[in-house]
Amino acid sequence: MACVSVDTCQFKKILAALPELPPHNWLITDLECYDTSGWDGCEKWAQRELLLTDETFRQDVKKRDMQFIWGVFSAIPTGYSEAEIRRYPLPEAETPRYMANSILPQHPLAILELYAQDGGLTFVSAREASLLEPLYRLDGAVRDEEADNRVMNTQLRRIQDILRQAVPEVSPRIADAVQWRVWWALFREKTGNVSDWFLRQAVMAEYRAQVRSPSRFPSVYWDPYAQK
């Protein structure tokens, strides 16, 4: 099990860096592509869902290196028919699974997955960690997403420990809003330790703010305790 994030949603360099995989096709779901007009073969990239041969996929990427905004690209061995592939739930783009400590390709038959997120990052996950090792030689930021998530979920548990000690019956909605607002303010892209006293002040201030004026954005509570 392994996952790395690469700071691009163009796949030409990513595909070139990957080692040779067993013969496979690409199941592409929840697709949103920036470059869907003005070149031969572009029409298919305006669809939300595709099943392409590896040859066709790589030819188009090599020719155009189009930017993907969203999409899940699942490499599935050629021995499986389309009917067999569709027996399982199709992979989704907007899912919290990429915040987990352990990340696998969503489709049970996939050996590797590319996930384009909001036009800026690609998450590459595989059932064998060795498949991802060459990606660390790419230019730009390449990060071990599982390692980053373990740190993040530890930080979220610190926030929740303080909140639940003070407010044992806190609602999931408020708990989720508090943990993310505090995490973004104190931990996101910052180094150094945050003291318990300072964190407690921030957590309780955000809790009071949420009670007075709850966040209007719907959310599903992300449980960092489930990631231990």
Regions found by a protein language model. Give the residues of each.
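N-terminal interaction modules that seed assembly of large macromolecular complexes
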Residues: 2-5, 9-60, 182-183, 187
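Ordered hydrophobic segments in well-structured contexts
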Residues: 3, 25-29, 70-75, 113-114, ...
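A broadly conserved detector of short glycine/acidic/proline-rich loop/turn motifs that flank catalytic sites
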Residues: 32, 77-79, 128
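Surface-exposed, low-hydrophobicity interaction/linker segments
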Residues: 40-115
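Acidic, proline/glycine-rich low-complexity IDRs
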Residues: 103-161, 165, 218-224
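Short, aromatic- and cysteine-enriched interfacial helices/patches
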Residues: 162, 167, 186, 191-194, ...
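Extended non-catalytic scaffold regions that mediate assembly and binding
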Residues: 173-176, 217-228
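Acidic, low-complexity, intrinsically disordered interaction modules
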Residues: 173-215
